[in-house]
């Protein structure tokens, strides 16, 4: 009611209004206070704390770690020469007041930091490694030119030789398996195309772009160009992958209930077909055409053989598929 109150010298624990209110409530009796329950969610399930983007990043980190990759955290600033190797290094990404000459530009890719870390490890005698990093990359000076990527590198041998077999060098199919695994765990569409034509730091003819249509790229995998490895003093076979997290569409909120099971009246069968086509025809063209011929009954089309030479003649190849 506005009455003044003084604190005795032997009560140094009372520092403010909240402490005074607590003392009054204790003297009067806490049982006389009316309890007010906290508001509860009507669905009895707490709302998620992480956003969809944060949850996707967390899932991709865990997926890469489960595949045996060690996470790196590097600076977003790199030197001009390294930036130019990956398509950057122009005035739009240059810092006005850089920390040093080695941190003068915003990174256009995550590979410079990963390769620098790999080079330092190789200088100390560690030649087999699997590293990944998740972070922003910058393709210009405007806010819309920033996107989040997940990149990883495999270097050296897959495993040490033992009584069960010899070791082997890492190859493109190792990272192809890894990137497809991560994409499936973060909810990317399972139907995609693998095309060519990535940036110049990828080895020509030894890489692939995972696309949703001909223009929307969600991932790249393959061997890194030898000139890139030479610039960072990397020894041994090196393959890598990049996932463009911002390009992956967010899955729609679908109903959790499943439709009733409907048994098919047709028996499951497999048939093999071989087609003679031009040497430059992509296998995905054949599989897409085969899948589209009878979408209601065809569940899967996969390539199992390719033959070039023999009686086919120049500029021809045979592609065999299983339907």
Regions found by a protein language model. Give the residues of each.
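Extended, well-folded interaction surfaces typified by the phenylalanyl-tRNA synthetase beta subunit core
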Residues: 1-132
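A carboxyl-terminal module marker
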Residues: 4, 13, 145, 151, ...
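Hydrophobic/anchoring residues in structured secondary elements
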Residues: 38, 74, 136-139, 194, ...
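Hydrophobic alpha-helix feature that most strongly marks membrane-spanning transmembrane helices
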Residues: 26-29, 65, 69, 77, ...
